[in-house]
């Protein structure tokens, strides 16, 4: 246990989401898909254009590049150089996954000659944060979608037992005491209190930092990569100039659709 972990005290035990949230995940994700189809054209009109810098999108636990293909196409149309993670289904940090991710990041930086923005859903967001922690000079910013990096995450996650079966805790290659600390790059955590897979309290920053922000949206966990509110947020965050990062500020209609914004 690290000194910072000792200072915070024992790991809190946070319960998983309620049965109601878990059982309605699929139905609510379907609503998000329908909302996306209805708002897709408007999204393309109001989303800020990109500057061509590279972006890598990482899938959540048990997901693959197909799961976030629609989001990647949207960002490509905004003029970003978008890439998937290219490693099939995300089963956790096993079989050298983190080493391959490091190589993937280095390759993209060499190919484009610029730092990469990382967008990660759930477990993919945790991987993104750890890459940025290890290679801050190669990562422009991190955007996590419902990623349980906070303390108490193992008790607060419905698929925790399956994850632990595939990735025994004693074999995890990442220091678990550091996960809740933000990496030294601009970092945005997008979360929903309606998350039916992981408890929302583990998906946002506990403490304020100069370059971190947590933004609350309405939606499910499984539908985050197909949520039009999140698509707009990701586009807005990616469009912020690298040397001029600023927190997201709600204005007008955004105050209704994004109910919580805090450091």
Region locations from a protein language model:
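Short beta->alpha connector loops
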Residues: 36, 62-63, 196
């Amino acid at each position: 246990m690290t000194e910072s972990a000792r200072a915070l005290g024992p790991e809190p035990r946070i319960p998983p989401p309620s049965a109601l949230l878990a059982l309605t995940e699929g139905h609510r994700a379907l609503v998000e898909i329908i909302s996306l189809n209805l708002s897709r054209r408007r999204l393309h009109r109001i989303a800020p254009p990109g500057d061509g810098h590279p972006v890598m999108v990482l899938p959540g636990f048990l997901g693959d590049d197909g799961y976030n293909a629609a989001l990647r196409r949207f960002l490509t149309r905004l003029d970003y150089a978008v890439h998937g993670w290219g490693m099939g289904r995300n089963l956790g940090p096993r079989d050298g996954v983190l080493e391959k991710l490091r190589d993937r990041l280095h390759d993209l930086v060499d190919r484009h000659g610029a730092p990469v923005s990382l967008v990660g859903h759930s477990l993919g967001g945790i991987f993104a944060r750890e890459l940025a922690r290890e290679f801050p000079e190669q990562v422009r910013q991190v955007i996590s979608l419902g990623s349980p990096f906070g303390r108490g995450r193992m008790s607060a996650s419905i698929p925790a037992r399956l994850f632990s079966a595939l990735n025994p805790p004693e074999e995890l290659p990442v220091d678990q005491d550091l996960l809740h600390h933000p990496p030294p790059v601009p970092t945005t955590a997008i979360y929903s209190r309606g998350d039916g897979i992981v408890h929302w309290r583990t998906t946002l920053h506990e403490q304020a930092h100069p370059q971190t922000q947590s933004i609350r949206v309405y939606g499910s966990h499984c539908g985050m990569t197909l949520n039009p509110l999140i698509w707009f947020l990701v586009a807005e965050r990616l469009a912020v100039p690298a040397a001029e990062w600023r927190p997201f500020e709600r204005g007008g209609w955004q105050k209704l659709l994004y109910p919580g914004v805090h450091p």
